[in-house]
Amino acid sequence: MLTNLFLFFFCRCNAFALFLKNQRRWVSPALKPADITAFHEFCKKYNYNPRTEILPHGSYLINLGNPDAAKREQARDAFIDDLRRCEQLGIGLYNLHPGSSLGSDKQETLQRIADGINDAIKETEFVKVVLENMAGHGHIVGSQLEDLAQIIELVQDKARVGVCIDTCHAFAAGFDLRESTKFTAFWADFDRIVGYKYLAAIHLNDSKAPLGSKRDLHQNIGLGFLGLEAFRLIVNKPELEGLPMVLETPEDAKLGHDVRGDEIKLLEWLVGKDADDEEVLAKSKALQAKGAKERAEHQKKYNDKLEKEERPKKRQRKLFE
């Protein structure tokens, strides 16, 4: 049951994520008392603090920004149910994709999202809603730091709201984290626009797609367009120390969850390392070589997409000439 979701991880990591129910169904059976007890026992046995070290991921169905009132109400009910499950388990953080405007006015969408959070906070006691930054595809909101800041501004109880930065999503949205100067600039902007006091978690993912692609395509650490240096910078940034950092990287079909264990060891190994460390440079080069073919494939797809988008513009220019 619930505890089986993290049996693969407890010997290797000190934070983890899970789903509270079937993430692709609106309604799921209530948590069984035996599962709740077992969850608490496992957390105690393996020294997890559920208030600060466990980050459940919200259902993919939930869209608090939906302009359709009936569908938005359905999303709110599912959202509140998730938060209540967190509190049954003693979990203090809950990760949420902000939502989509579905083509409606963006400012009204942000208000609807905040209204949904405010309603849920009134119905629950302590769990913090952690808004995740998004890649920027289509009408999804949350790819810009200003989106997250505006939602937070509209939330009444600001002690109950925070932010999770997903490295793949940030990169896909156009934030370059690959070298020190730009990495530092991103976090300076984050502190100015949102504020470190709201930073509650990190999702550690490399990116299969290029910078600014708006594609939410996670890759294993060091194999993608972000590369190893971005993660060296992250694990050595003092302001991020102590936050739950969750890997959402692809599983290897042969190794299964073991690939995550290897990535955890790699990230721990990077702590205290400098950018010019010969071992780090060699490891980075090896990982980039391993991921080169897949990067080339996605770069071509992205280039083809840009070229396709440019064709109507070229034809339109000719018509006006």
Locate predicted features.
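Hydrophobic faces of well-ordered beta-strands that scaffold small-molecule active sites
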Residues: 1, 16-18, 52-58, 94-96, ...
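Acidic (Asp/Glu)-rich catalytic clusters
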Residues: 6-13, 32-55, 80-90, 118-125, ...
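Active-site beta-loop-alpha junctions enriched in small/polar residues
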Residues: 1, 21-23, 59-61, 99-101, ...
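Short, acidic/polar
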Residues: 1-7, 74-83, 183-190
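Active-site acidic/histidine proton-transfer and metal-coordination neighborhood
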Residues: 64-162
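Structural motif corresponding to the early beta-alpha repeats
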Residues: 18-108, 245
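Histidine-acidic metal/acid-base catalytic patches
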Residues: 149-167, 171-321
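Alpha-helix N-cap and loop-to-helix initiation/capping positions
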Residues: 27-35, 66-78, 104-115, 139-147, ...
